[in-house]
Amino acid sequence: MAKYTRLRYDVTEVPLADLVREVMGEEDLEGLAASDRVATRETDQSTPYHRRFYDNVDVISPVYRTLVHRLLGDEVDAVYIQRIPTFRVHLRNSVAVGSWHRDRDFGHDPSEVNYWVPLTRAYGNNTLWIDEEPVHAEYGEVIVFDGANSWHGNVVNDTETSRVSMDFRTLPRSSYEPNDRKSISYGLPFRLGEYWDTV
C-alpha cells in the first residue's frame, strides 16, 4: 500500500483552479482535448498548456505561496520550497509523465518531500500512481508523499476527463547542499534562488 498523507485546503481562499483556467483561457480543465500522441519524458512538459502556465507563473506564484503557507504553517521556515511549481496535464489517451521514476534518480535530494495538488478530479487512470496504487483525490486536496524514494508515475488516461495538477517539493534547510545537477522539467540548477526558494 502506498504511503502518503492527504491534506485539505479551502479553495475559496486559495482558488488555484480558477487562476489556472484564467491564465490558460480554458473554462473546463477536465475537458481539455484528448492527446493524439503519448507523452515521453522529453515531451511531457512541452504542450501549449504548459507554455501558458509557465508564461504566467508570476501571476500564479502569489497564490501558490499562499497555499504553501497554509499547508506548512510554522514549518515553512525550516524548509526551502520549489520556486516554480511543476505543472501537469494528463490528457485523455496520454501519459502525463514519460516513465515511472523516483525523483532521486534524476538528481533530487533523498530528503525532499513531494506535494501533489490536483486542480481537477483525479480518479481511475487519470490520477497519479504511487507504489503501483492509484491515488484518488479531489480539487482542494493535497497528497504529500516521499517522491524522492517512492516509485510514482501515471498510466494511459482512459477516462473521459483530463486531469490537471501541479506539484512542488520541499527540502529541509539542514539538507541543502548546492550542486550543479539540474531539474528535468525545466533545467534549473538545484540551487537557492533558482530551483529552491524561501517562502
Curated annotation (Swiss-Prot):
A single GO BP: streptomycin biosynthetic process
Keywords: Antibiotic biosynthesis, Streptomycin biosynthesis
Domain of life of the source: Bacteria
Pathway in which the depicted protein is active: Antibiotic biosynthesis; streptomycin biosynthesis
SUPFAM superfamilies for this protein: Clavaminate synthase-like
Function: May be involved in the formation of N-methyl-L-glucosamine.
Name of the protein: Streptomycin biosynthesis protein StrG
Organism whose genome encodes this protein: Streptomyces griseus
